[in-house]
Amino acid sequence: MTKSLGYISLGCAKNLVDTEVMLGLLKDDGYTITDNLYEADLIIINTCTFIEKAKEESINTILEAAQYKETGRCKGLIVAGCLSQQYQDELFTEIPEIDALIGTGAWDQVMVAVDAIEHGNRSCIMENITNIYDERMPRIQTTPRYSAYVKIAEGCNNGCTFCIIPKVRGAFRSRSIESIKAEVERLAASGVKEIVLIAQDTTSYGIDLNNGKPLLTELLKELTKVEGIEWIRMLYLYPTFFSDELLDIIVNEPKLCKYVDIPLQHVNNNILKQMNRRDSREDIERLLKKIRNAPTHVTLRTSIIVGFPGETDEQFQELCEFVKDIKFDNMGVFTYSQEEGTIAGAREDQIPEEVKEERYHTLMSIQAAISEENNRDLEGTIDYAMIEELEEGDNDTVLAKGRLKSQAPDVDGNMYIEDCGDKVKPGDIVQVQVEQGFAYDVVATIVE
């Protein structure tokens, strides 16, 4: 009898990779994947606990999935990921519908959990937080066939005072260059054209393998040799180890997207110190100046936290002026989330929620105007774009949706071609001219 598997993966792309590996292991055991949770014999929820809203979403998703034990075919509910790692006792006690909990380093034990369910037992598998997958693990790609995430490291050593990740993901540990390259070669052979390299701290890649010195540029040099891969993109480039050598290869290697995602979180020196960030405002300014002065334009993305404990109006205004001055191409803004088990979470000078929300909307409004200005500056320029979706428009036209080489999947805006006819299909990389720029998206035409 065919066994069906339903899943929901929450949180970041790093979590999604863990989900894809678990799906691969279950498929090897005979499960078929269904998009309809009502029809699933087994349901896996891979959870996130990074901020309070992520916790709430995870819990609500678990409760919704638990209903399929009564209304659907579900005979086993497995909850994996960061929420499981952090709140295992509470989850098992308060949600009895959960059959198994799998920690962040125990994704490769998913079949042990399934076996326990089949024997009528509940299980909680939390050991081996030092684990990391490699190229030998089966993996079911859930992203479009032409684009895939590749996790090059796991865990984090930075110890930011607002963040729970080191406690739930463990110490920083890198995969070998050989393992990553072998996986990328396999992905390329399956039709992947774009790889997105991810880690909690991507620029620190290799420090645990090379006496404290990063190996990211060495990794990139090897990955550019893989035939079939046309775009290589990196996310989560922590500023401390962002070297001149790394900038040089980004600028000069054709396969590398001229795209830099640097999570700065803040720029006020007192706030940065209280966050336990290694870089000062002056360090940040020097780095961004180098990137802005590069011989080729490099798209800049960052993420910012507003409402950190003790953040004054003056410190927030300093942040706003900095954003106006740098003019980031893309920016994610988060309101500070008071997390249990963190140093910042224990502070008494928490900012009221209404103040955090006001600061969030203020900064997002500033960035929207900057993004629109930057996108308008793209009008008339030529770039490469990846086609992702086609849909019927008015008067028998075909609308194409995709991304410029300067736009990352899931987090940035989109590129639209209003009438592409039958010239393109999903996965194609084509040359386009930007015709109109808006706050987050652009409209383009294909260059014949």
Describe these PLM feature segments.
Residues 53, 172-179, 211-215, 276-283, ...:
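Alpha-helix N-cap and loop-to-helix initiation/capping positions
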